[in-house]
């Protein structure tokens, strides 16, 4: 069943009854995305919060010079969304591109709010998930300011070997905030 991974993900944070889980998962809909296709592009309004069942996504922005800067990756068993666009219903600054054929479960804002109203523990679930996401972002910011590009590169490939194996050097460089040529130099020296 496609919802098994979602159920496992949410129940590691908050306990739900079987009935609650059925109602929770019924509000998600499945979407398949082919490699290199976009789930969201800059300028669109993000109308979903997503959970990755299969595959991997790169979430990135395009700067004024046309460079792609990767903010994060979302692999199997990870959540993805543009929280600013989703919550405020404003155009997104983000692009979400599948790095391989992928499948996601999506929930729209209206249904998510209905879950909050129906099951107060859903708010607790998403609060816990938001706190974990903030911790992750804080660690990433600290690493970006505390470590050299070489240290960040080795930390990334050590922590996320499965994701790193799916990426081009240009995509890794965009995530690390360095030029592709500099990453090539780091790899040659290692």
Question: Which role does the model predict for each range below?
Answer:
Residues 147-190:
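Phosphate-/nucleic-acid-contacting segments
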Residues 6, 133-142:
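Short, Lys/Arg-enriched N-terminal segment that forms or immediately precedes the first helix
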Residues 39-44:
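Short phosphate-coordinating micro-motif centered on Lys-Gly-acidic
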């Amino acid at each position: 069943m496609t919802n098994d991974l979602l159920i496992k993900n949410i129940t590691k944070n908050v306990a739900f009854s079987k009935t609650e889980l059925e109602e929770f998962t019924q509000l998600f809909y499945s979407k398949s995305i082919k490699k290199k296709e976009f789930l969201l592009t800059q300028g669109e309004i993000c109308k979903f919060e997503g959970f990755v069942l299969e595959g991997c996504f790169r979430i990135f922005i395009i700067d004024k010079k046309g460079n792609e800067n990767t903010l994060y990756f979302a692999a199997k068993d990870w959540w993805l969304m543009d929280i600013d666009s989703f919550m405020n219903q404003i155009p997104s600054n983000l692009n979400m591109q599948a790095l391989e054929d992928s499948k996601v479960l999506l929930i729209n804002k209206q249904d998510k709010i209905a879950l909050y109203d129906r099951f107060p523990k859903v708010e607790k679930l998403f609060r816990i998930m938001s706190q974990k996401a903030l911790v992750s972002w804080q660690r990433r910011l600290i690493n970006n300011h505390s470590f050299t590009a070489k240290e960040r590169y080795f930390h990334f490939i050590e922590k996320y070997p499965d994701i790193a194996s799916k990426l081009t050097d240009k995509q890794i460089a965009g995530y690390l905030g360095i030029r592709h040529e500099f990453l090539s130099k780091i790899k040659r020296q290692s």
